[in-house]
Each structure stands twice: as structure tokens, then as C-alpha cells.
Amino acid sequence: METGPTGATGATGVTGATGPTGATGATGATGASAIIPFASGIPLSLTTIAGGLVGTPGFVGFGSSAPGLSIVGGVIDLTNAAGTLTNFAFSMPRDGTITSISAYFSTTAALSLVGSTITITATLYQSTAPNNSFTAVPGATVTLAPPLTGILSVGSISSGIVTGLNIAATAQTRFLLVFTATASGLSLVNTVAGYASAGIAIN
């Protein structure tokens, strides 16, 4: 017996009911963070004053820098009616989280610090208002190592990094990176010059 021709395809049936939602998948990897770079361009000149306290700080921007204004009562005021070079702050365009800060300093003049030690720090200051008054961000300080001591040639290097931070950075907050020096030992009044650079990671 011969098989007859194949008949026409029937109409498509009604779509079945949607099945239950599957289990939630594993959390994906954390997205890449933004890196904000800082470089002094010309050398900074940091000073310490009587008692080994912070004297003149250095403000560092994106390839430029300047001697900073005095830190009075923990506050830096950038209003500066004199109009000199002081505004090295940047503004956050979105909310984020600061996760790490690294900093570096290389001397550009020989130093004799026999019996004395100079410690350099880099601190992130913020103005959340935002306005021209900046205060240090808690936890956002890098102490550079090794400290400067003894007979130092040009190109002596100190550096440091702080990781594992979880510092909220809200949109429109202004941030300012400030290098300072403190001293201990025989000579408490000092000047140290050098190139400074740093970077902060913001998720």
C-alpha cells in the first residue's frame, strides 16, 4: 500500500501558561571604579613650625599645585579674596564611595635631618554644603613611609596607600587633596620640597 501525501500543517495551538520564575542568580562582580589622579607638576614646599606642627600645607590638583592656605581649627577656607592660586578642589558629579587612596612624595632638594624626623601625610578634605570651607574626611589620610630623617639626597621617596575604605561621597561634594608635614626630634622648624602625586578610587 502506498503512503499518501503529507497533509497541511494544522493551526498553532494556544500558548501555554507562563512557568514559575526561576531562582535569583548569583550577584555579579563589582563594577569598575573611577580613579581620580593628582600630580603637583612643580615641587611643593611644605613647612613645619614651632613644636613640629603643620606649617604651610600644599594643595595638589591635576598637574598643578600651590602652597596652601593655613589650616585654622581644622578648617581650610578657599574663599581667598586675594585671588591667588588656591582652588584645587573638584566636585562630585554623582554619588559614590571612596575605597582607597595612595600618595607619593619625592624630594627635590637635599636635606640634613640628623636627629630629626619629618613625616608627610596626604589628606582628603571635603565641603559637603558645598561652599568654600573644607574639613578633613575621617579615615581619608595616608601617612607616607619611610619618614624623612638623616642625610637625604635629591629623589628620596616616601609613599603610602590606604585600602578597604567605605567613605560615602555624595553628589556636589567638593574634595581637596592636601599634603602636610610634621616634625619631631632636634629641629622642629623645617622646610621640605618635593614632587607630590596621589590617586583615589571611587566606586
Regions found by a protein language model. Give the residues of each.
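Extracellular jelly-roll beta-sandwich "head" domains, especially the C-terminal globular C1q domain
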Residues: 29-203
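Collagen/collagen-like triple-helix recognition
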Residues: 1-37
